[in-house]
């Protein structure tokens, strides 16, 4: 698959009050051999600590990071992922959980035929 044929690549990262894991996850996205065009963090009602971490990492990121948050009313992961897909501008979407450390070629491997 050719990157140009795909258009924009969006990575959606779901999270809930796991700043330690989210930071590791996002830093591993920074080191991808093929960078996404945007990363959308779907936050299922985390505290302000998560928003602060995301704000700090937005300043360092080699791509836009968009923080999508909704109030904590129980586990609503599917609803949050749907909001993130609606917010994305990518033609190709990769969904991951916020506690995943990514291999540097994860996106490149997705693009292989």
Residue ranges and their predicted role:
Residues 70, 96:
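Catalytic metal- and UDP-sugar-binding loop of GT-A-like glycosyltransferases, i.e.
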